[in-house]
Structure formats: structure tokens, C-alpha cells
């Protein structure tokens, strides 16, 4: 006895349409992908090549001096490089942690019903939409020791002026500026998460006797974890790449207390004019950022995949 299995014509038609749709998407995407490959790929290849040379702007023809991995080993042996790594890590960890905490606080407040909530939301967006260069200039004026607004206010209250950009507090002052500008980003992401929370679940928990703190701890916070991770991943990458504000506020000083990796790369390229070493620093910087942000991104996509299945 023979059992024959036939595939319904509808299923075959569905698969055929799916293949056609996928191939159409691929063909329409290929021109843009090719342009992106040229625009991004070619400079990356050239920069990696130059990181293997002894190219210096003060030595004609040095862009052809192939020296292998010498730039990388010199950078990794440099105490200035590791000092920049330390400053970058402190800057990133403290700034992103404060932005996350304040973002959660402001998002919870903005999720409540109160008079003027729309105005407050609009005002919160202002720091985020200002370009970093303008933010750096604006806060440098506020931080001026003799004529700055902050020290003027302290003087009217009877306090001594604070050297905001001095050796001891310069990094903290730079962190304050980044927190001021980037907390709204965290707030918007987390507010979107709060507004997607199932109200029926919250109402059921409250009906069972859960207080506000318990609802936040066991329902709201776990629901917000993916949103916090998205915001944290973007902000870690953003903080690592931050240059404008730091350069305009402190030039990386006093000394090297605010010299992050981006400022260190700039100083090497545009003060020492060592392009080969600068490109090596840039590639090390890329690996450094990926090593920190990749676990967050991987966990985020892994959680999304688990939730989908």
C-alpha cells in the first residue's frame, strides 16, 4: 500500500511569493549596500593600512614606510594611552550610570498625570537637540572662574568661587555637562517602555495588595530592562566617542585628567602629526568600544529572540 503526500497548491504559491519578495528586497538593497561599502569600506581599508605605516606629516614620503604592528605595540606600551583608557572608563561608567538613574526618575514622573506635563516634556528635549559644540561653549561660559554664572551665584550666597575646570574637579564638571545633555535620551526611551506596560497587569497586582514600590520592583523594572539596555548601549558608544564637549571645555586638561581616548587620538594626530600612530589608536579604540558594548547588544538581541519564541 502506497501513501502519497501532496503539498497543497496554496502552500507552494505562498513559498513562491515569499522567495520573490525576498529576492526583490535583495535586488533593491544591493545598490545602496554597494554605495555604503564603498563609502565606508574603502576608508576603513586605507586607515588600517596607514596604521601599519610610519606616516608622519612632518616626514615627506613616510606614508610608504611599512612598519607592521609597531604602532600598535608602541600605543599599548604607552602610559598616556592607559591613562586615557582609565579616564574614558570613569567618564563612561559614571556618566551613563547617572543618566540611567535620572532617566528612570524623570520617566516615572512624566508618566504621571499633572498640570504642565507636556511643557515639561518639551523643555526636557532642549539639551538633547543642542549640538555638542554649542553645549561645550555654553558650559565653559558657565564654568568661568571669574565671570561665570555659577561662581557669581555662589558669591551672592557668600561662598568662595569654585575652579570648575581645575585639576581636581575638571572630570566631574565634564561629566555634569554630559549628564545634562544626555539624560533626556534615557528619559524618552524609558518613558516609551513605561507607556507600553500592560495596565491590566498593574491593576491586578494592586488589587492583590501590592504597593507602589512592589509594583515598580517586580513589574515595572523587569519590563524596563530591555529599554534600559538599548539606551545604555547607545550612550556607552556615544560617551566613548565624545570629543567636542571635552575639547571645548578643557582641551583634555589640566594635565591629562580629562584626556579620553578620542582626545588622545586627536592630540597624537594634530599636535604630534603622527598619522600612522593615530590610525592605530583609532582601531584600538574601535575594538575597545565593541568589547564594552557588544555584550549589552548581544544580551538585548538574545532576550528579544527568546521572547519571540
Swiss-Prot record:
Residues passing through the membrane, by range: 25-45, 89-109, 123-143, 174-194, 221-241, 246-266, 278-298
Subcellular location: Cell inner membrane
Principal place of residence: membrane
One biological process term in Gene Ontology: transmembrane transport
GO CC list: plasma membrane
Membrane topology designation: Multi-pass membrane protein
Task of the protein: Probably part of the binding-protein-dependent transport system y4oPQRS. This system probably transports a sugar-like molecule. Probably responsible for the translocation of the substrate across the membrane.
Family according to the record: Belongs to the binding-protein-dependent transport system permease family. MalFG subfamily.
Protein name per the record: Probable ABC transporter permease protein y4oQ
Organism: Sinorhizobium fredii (strain NBRC 101917 / NGR234)
Amino acid at each position: 500500500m502506497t501513501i502519497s503526500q501532496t503539498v497543497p497548491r496554496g502552500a507552494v504559491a505562498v513559498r513562491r511569493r515569499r522567495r520573490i519578495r525576498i529576492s526583490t528586497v535583495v535586488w533593491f538593497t544591493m545598490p545602496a549596500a554597494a554605495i555604503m561599502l564603498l563609502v565606508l569600506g574603502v576608508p576603513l581599508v586605507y586607515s588600517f593600512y596607514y596604521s601599519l605605516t610610519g606616516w608622519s606629516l612632518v616626514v615627506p614620503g613616510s606614508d610608504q614606510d611599512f612598519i607592521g604592528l609597531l604602532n600598535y605595540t608602541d600605543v599599548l606600551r604607552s602610559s598616556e594611552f592607559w591613562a586615557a583608557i582609565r579616564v574614558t572608563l570613569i567618564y563612561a561608567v559614571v556618566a551613563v550610570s547617572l543618566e540611567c538613574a535620572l532617566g528612570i526618575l524623570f520617566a516615572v514622573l512624566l508618566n504621571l498625570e499633572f498640570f504642565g506635563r507636556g511643557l515639561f516634556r518639551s523643555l526636557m528635549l532642549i539639551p538633547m537637540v543642542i549640538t555638542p559644540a554649542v553645549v561645550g561653549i555654553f558650559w565653559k561660559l558657565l564654568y568661568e572662574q571669574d565671570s561665570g554664572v555659577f561662581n557669581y551665584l555662589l558669591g551672592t550666597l557668600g561662598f568662595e568661587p569654585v575652579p570648575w575646570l581645575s585639576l581636581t574637579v575638571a572630570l566631574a564638571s565634564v561629566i555634569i555637562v554630559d549628564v545634562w545633555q544626555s539624560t533626556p535620551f534615557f528619559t524618552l526611551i524609558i518613558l516609551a517602555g513605561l507607556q507600553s506596560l500592560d495596565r491590566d497587569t498593574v491593576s491586578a497586582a494592586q488589587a492583590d495588595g501590592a504597593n507602589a514600590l512592589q509594583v515598580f520592583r517586580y513589574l515595572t523594572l523587569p519590563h524596563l530592562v530591555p529599554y534600559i539596555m538599548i539606551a545604555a548601549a547607545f550612550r556607552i558608544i556615544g560617551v566613548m566617542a565624545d570629543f567636542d564637549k571635552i575639547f571645548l571645555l578643557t582641551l583634555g586638561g589640566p594635565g591629562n585628567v580629562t584626556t579620553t581616548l578620542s582626545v588622545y587620538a586627536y592630540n597624537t594626530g594634530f599636535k604630534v602629526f603622527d598619522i600612522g600612530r593615530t590610525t592605530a589608536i583609532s582601531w584600538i579604540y574601535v575594538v575597545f568600544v565593541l568589547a564594552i558594548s557588544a555584550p549589552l547588544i548581544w544580551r538585548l538581541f538574545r532576550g528579544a529572540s527568546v521572547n519571540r519564541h
